Regions:
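Active-site glycine/GP-rich loop and adjacent strand/helix microenvironment
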Residues: 1-88
Length: 88
């Protein structure tokens, strides 16, 4: 099962596995840039599609956040030449 847009709790994952017999995989997307990251099959972390996307996590001033600190997501799409998305 592929989940997009909402947090899926551990209990929801277990229920989906029990009912449907399927593993739940998270993806991170936006309509304008498409798929940005997909959950790793080995752990719960997401891997960014670095071949076509640059993702930055920044604070309210636009400064890069330290690893693990929450912040705003800025996306630069590296594949869209007709309508570039830069720090969107």
């Amino acid at each position: 099962m592929l989940c997009t847009g909402e947090t899926v709790t551990g209990a929801m994952r277990r229920d989906c596995k029990a009912v449907f017999g399927a593993r739940v995989i998270d993806r991170y997307t936006c309509e304008e840039a498409g798929w940005l990251a997909l959950q790793c099959p080995k752990h719960e972390h997401l891997h960014v599609f670095t071949s076509n996307t640059l993702i930055e996590i920044v604070d309210a001033q636009g400064i890069a956040c330290p690893v693990g600190m929450p912040g705003r997501v800025l996306v630069t799409a590296l594949h869209s030449h007709a309508m570039p998305l830069i720090r969107y």
